[in-house]
Amino acid sequence: MDQKASYFINEKLFTEVKPVLFTDLIHHLKIGPSMAKKLMFDYYKQTTNAKYNCVVICCYKDQTIKIIHDLSNIPQQDSIIDCFIYAFNPMDSFIPYYDIIDQKDCLTIKNSYELKVSESSKIIERTKTLEEKSKPLVRPTARSKTTPEETTGRKSKSKDMGLRSTALLAKMKKDRDDKETSRQNELRKRKEENLQKINKQNPEREAQMKELNNLFVEDDLDTEEVNGGSKPNSPKETDSNDKDKNNDDLEDLLETTAEDSLMDVPKIQQTKPSETEHSKEPKSEEEPSSFIDEDGYIVTKRPATSTPPRKPSPVVKRALSSSKKQETPSSNKRLKKQGTLESFFKRKAK
């Protein structure tokens, strides 16, 4: 028994390098715990050359149990009730290792009764019942109905969508053009109304505009006679040319401001109001009278001076300047305008 125990301990402690517990001896040698403790103590006494650590468990009177690794320092030795070697450890730190062991044959208490395991009742297997396989009914195959493919419909839809998109774009463009034309027409109407109001308020200006228009028309007729030479024009062409020229002259006159139009009036019309003003001034100087007041002050009475002519309102200037910006005449109109102005100044110089 001692040889078996020592062989088992050496094998596990030095070859496998695992700790040996006293419970390992109980399971391996099938002995009781007191016998296992005795064998552990005998092995500790006999083997003095080998190096290993001994783990001891001490039971004290105050019902405390301590695991001691250092045998040289055992505390409270007088109060120890029981002490035994718990394990041999080949390493410094104690890590218990437990093997899986079948403990059916290692019972500490034995009796005359034997354990019997009842045999498991056999499971009666159910016989397989054969199911009748239903034969599929064979029916005559009917010809499938042919239907048109959906791809054509999809293609036509995509084409329709494309046509709709172009139509929508065209409609939107037309609406925008209509709005723009209506806006331009409204602006033209407003300009014409403003010009008519200005002409009604200032009849002198309207007369001046007519005179200027007649002068430009006469100059244009003279230039046409010089350029035309021996080529007589038909009455229809002359009428149409006169209308176009009149329209061009009116557009040019509309582009000029009120001050510019007044600058183009002949000198005779400008000298007349200046003479009248000079004639009025001495009268106004002769009219004031003076008399001596009760307090001895000289009091002079003068008539109220005539109000100076009003300048054209800024609204009119803005309307005329906006008409200048919006109406951009072509190169032909500019040439005509330059020609008429040159002829006008030549006549004026003569």
Swiss-Prot record:
Keywords: DNA replication, DNA-directed DNA polymerase, Nucleotidyltransferase, Nucleus, Phosphoprotein, Transferase. The keyword RNA-binding does not apply. It is found in: Nucleus. The modification Phosphoserine is found at S230. GO terms for molecular function: DNA-directed DNA polymerase activity; H3-H4 histone complex chaperone activity. One of its GO terms (biological process) is DNA replication, removal of RNA primer. Residues 320-332 have a biased composition (Polar residues). Its main location: nucleus. Residues 249-262 have a biased composition (Acidic residues). Residues 131-350 are annotated as: Disordered. GO terms for cellular component: delta DNA polymerase complex; nucleus; zeta DNA polymerase complex. The keyword tRNA processing does not apply. The modification Phosphothreonine is found at T223. Residues 146-162, 172-195, 234-248, 274-286 have a biased composition (Basic and acidic residues). DNA polymerase delta is a heterotrimer of POL3, POL32 and HYS2. POL32 can form homodimers. Present with 2410 molecules/cell in log phase SD medium. DNA polymerase delta (DNA polymerase III) participates in chromosomal DNA replication. It is required during synthesis of the leading and lagging DNA strands at the replication fork and binds at/or near replication origins and moves along DNA with the replication fork. It has 3'-5' proofreading exonuclease activity that correct errors arising during DNA replication. It is also involved in DNA synthesis during DNA repair. This is DNA polymerase delta subunit 3. It comes from Saccharomyces cerevisiae (strain ATCC 204508 / S288c). The lineage of its organism: Eukaryota, Fungi, Dikarya, Ascomycota, Saccharomycotina. The gene is POL32.
